[in-house]
Amino acid sequence: MCSVPRGNGVWAALRAFWAALTSYRADLRYPLFWQGLESLFTSETKAWKVTERLCTRLSFFLADNAQTQQDLFDKANICYDTRSKIIHGRWQPGTEINQPMADTEATVRTVVRHLLERPGMIGAFVSPKRDDFLDAWVQSKAFTPPPFTP
């Protein structure tokens, strides 16, 4: 992790994840986890359909088949909706945060594990070509990453 260069989505994500992990209150932790996921999976230049793009990219990154991809997309959409409620002041404290928090924490753990374990993933995600790489992955509808040329 010390080898991750600064000034890219991976660095921003790691900082957000660290801030989330060292926070206690759910309404502060939860958006930080999603800030990190947004740093990894949203576009730096395309500001339209952010939720759809985030959920699609995230679900293809994590899935190994079509059913899992759809399930992960749906779960990410629900969790991102919770993030939006918190950010926009519509969230009410209570136990309904427990499941989205558990799902989000599991997603973050799995994303970080895949970034570290899959050969070339850190390189692809710190690259200025990350957006093209993720678009190619989603367009391929494959459950393995496309070739990446730095």
Language-model segments: which ranges?
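Amphipathic, oligomerization/interface secondary-structure segments
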Residues: 1-150
